[in-house]
A protein has these predicted regions:
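Bacterial N-terminal signal peptides
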Residues: 19-30
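Intrinsic, low-complexity polybasic segments
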Residues: 3-6
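Sec/Tat signal peptide C-region and signal peptidase I cleavage site
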Residues: 31-36
Length: 192
């Protein structure tokens, strides 16, 4: 009979059957992984990854993007015009890219930026060896009641023409979920 489980007589047979079952499960899992979506933080032009965590008194936004999305190139700047573009990008990232629903009573906190190509923060050895250049950013919001916040608005599409899609992973006390924003959307709705 096709698809029927093999008979496992006796103790020795049970161990062999258990081992065979584990091999089968591992094979199925590896096939599924091969067709899964790219891991968060993977380098894909036009796409920004956001991880958002909502705690009782804090909202954290972790962003990862290829530099090309933000600058139009993926390397250290080579001339004065490119250095000017980098300075403008950094100022924009330190500005108000994310606005939290006033119901959460949040105020913007620290912004941390990291990019090996731009010599910002801690260099990522994997990025240096890959030939691709990314920018990772961390945005913190201190809140009186983060759980009351119903949304976060972002101006990423408005400020950076190279961004075509934003993949978001949310983690709150009400659970986790994924969503995707495309132009002209700017609101990330938080689970309530």
């Amino acid at each position: 009979m096709v698809g029927a489980a093999p008979a496992c007589p006796g103790d020795a047979g049970t161990m062999r059957c258990a081992a065979a079952a584990l091999v089968a499960i591992a094979s199925i899992a590896s096939i599924g992984a091969a067709f899964a979506a790219p891991p968060l933080g993977s380098h894909q032009h036009g796409v920004v990854q956001l991880d958002i965590a909502v705690d009782a008194n804090r909202i954290s936004v972790q962003m990862s993007s290829p530099l090309d999305n933000l600058l139009g190139f993926e390397r250290a700047p080579r001339n004065e015009a490119e250095r000017g573009r980098v300075a403008a990008m950094l100022a924009t990232l330190r500005d108000t890219l994310f606005v939290v629903d006033p119901a959460g009573a949040c105020r913007a906190g620290a912004v941390q930026l990291s990019s090996a190509a731009l010599k910002l923060g801690e260099p990522d050895p994997a990025e240096q060896q890959s030939g691709h250049a990314d920018l990772d950013a961390s945005f913190e919001f201190d809140c009186s009641s983060a759980a009351r916040a119903g949304f976060i608005d972002t101006s990423l599409f408005e400020r950076f023409a190279g961004i075509q899609r934003i993949d978001v992973q949310l983690a709150t006390s009400r659970g986790q979920r994924k969503l995707t924003l495309t132009r002209p959307a700017q609101r990330i709705v938080l689970p309530r």
